[in-house]
């Protein structure tokens, strides 16, 4: 796996799924392939994206700045600086300086990542802030190692939180989660449907599912009433895909 492929993998792991994720993936691919060289336009685009947390925007801004060649005097962006200030905690800044000194001695991506993984997310963000604000310089490989270590920590905590939700025994949370998943799957079906004859059928199924979820939320139903809702939808989706000659098992 190449260095840039690895960086793209880690960065995308912290971006929530949806159309925006696909857009960001495309932007990253273009940047890494040297196709997008207008850093200012890229940062302006990133700044106005909805849904993303300030830290995720800060990390993406840092990656874009590292990768896109720019004029020396190009101004640093406030939204990235604010996201990478470690919540203004002086302890984070102290640790960030210590980490920065270690990163100065690291020249490889994996070496830098290993060193960085032993620090807190706040310290890692502050360290990125130091480099972003040109208070210090490290090799691009070391900076990418720092980025990937930060993303790994964020993805770990997101995964723990997701696992807690999936394994919860609280019937109300499970019920709502099933309805949200059914609704998301329905939306995906509508987006994939396109404009063929069978598409009308897929759209109909998706639309009915969304109406059912809406009704269940409006009226309030028993927590077990949503059981099987997403699975039924998936069966319909897969039957539709088979007829269209498409095989996608990814929604499972």
UniProtKB/Swiss-Prot annotation:
The keyword RNA-binding applies. One of its GO terms (cellular component) is membrane. It is found in: Virion membrane; Host nucleus. It is a peripheral membrane protein. Pfam families: Flu_M1 (PF00598), Flu_M1_C (PF08289). Keywords: Host nucleus, Membrane, RNA-binding, Viral matrix protein, Virion. GO terms for biological process: viral budding from plasma membrane. Residues 165-252 are annotated as: RNP-binding. The keyword Membrane applies. GO terms for molecular function: RNA binding; structural constituent of virion. InterPro entries: Flu_matrix_M1 (IPR036039), Flu_matrix_M1_C (IPR013188), Flu_matrix_M1_N (IPR001561), Flu_matrix_M1_N_sub1 (IPR015423), Flu_matrix_M1_N_sub2 (IPR015799), INFV_M1 (IPR037533). Residues 1-164 are annotated as: Membrane-binding. A motif (Nuclear localization signal) lies at residues 101-105. Belongs to the influenza viruses Matrix protein M1 family. Plays critical roles in virus replication, from virus entry and uncoating to assembly and budding of the virus particle. M1 binding to ribonucleocapsids (RNPs) in nucleus seems to inhibit viral transcription. Interaction of viral NEP with M1-RNP is thought to promote nuclear export of the complex, which is targeted to the virion assembly site at the apical plasma membrane in polarized epithelial cells. Interactions with NA and HA may bring M1, a non-raft-associated protein, into lipid rafts. Forms a continuous shell on the inner side of the lipid bilayer in virion, where it binds the RNP. Most abundant protein in virion. When expressed alone can form virus-like particles in transfected cells. Homodimer and homomultimer. Interacts with NEP. Binds ribonucleocapsid by both interacting with genomic RNA and NP protein. May interact with HA and NA. Cannot bind NP without genomic RNA. This is Matrix protein 1.
């Amino acid at each position: 796996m190449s260095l840039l492929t690895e960086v793209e993998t880690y960065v995308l792991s912290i971006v929530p799924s949806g159309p925006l994720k696909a857009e960001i993936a495309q932007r990253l691919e273009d940047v890494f392939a040297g196709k997008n060289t207008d850093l200012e336009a890229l940062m302006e685009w990133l700044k106005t994206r909805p849904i993303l947390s300030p830290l995720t925007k800060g990390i993406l801004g840092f990656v874009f700045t590292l990768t896109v060649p720019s004029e020396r005097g190009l101004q640093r962006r406030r939204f990235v600086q604010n996201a990478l200030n470690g919540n203004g905690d002086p302890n984070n800044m102290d640790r960030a300086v210590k980490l920065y000194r270690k990163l100065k001695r690291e020249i490889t991506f994996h070496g830098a990542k290993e060193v960085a993984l032993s620090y807190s997310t706040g310290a890692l963000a502050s360290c990125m802030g130091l480099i972003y604000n040109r208070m210090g310089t490290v090799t691009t490989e070391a900076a990418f190692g720092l980025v990937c270590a930060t993303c790994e920590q964020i993805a770990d905590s997101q995964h723990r939180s997701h696992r807690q939700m999936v394994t919860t025994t609280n019937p109300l949370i499970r019920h709502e989660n099933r309805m949200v998943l059914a609704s998301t799957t329905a939306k995906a079906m509508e987006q994939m449907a396109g404009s063929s004859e069978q598409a009308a059928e897929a759209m109909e199924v998706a639309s009915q599912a969304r109406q059912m979820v809406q009704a269940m939320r409006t009226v309030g139903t028993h927590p077990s009433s949503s059981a099987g809702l997403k699975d039924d939808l998936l069966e319909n989706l897969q039957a539709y895909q088979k007829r269209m000659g498409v095989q996608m098992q990814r929604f499972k």
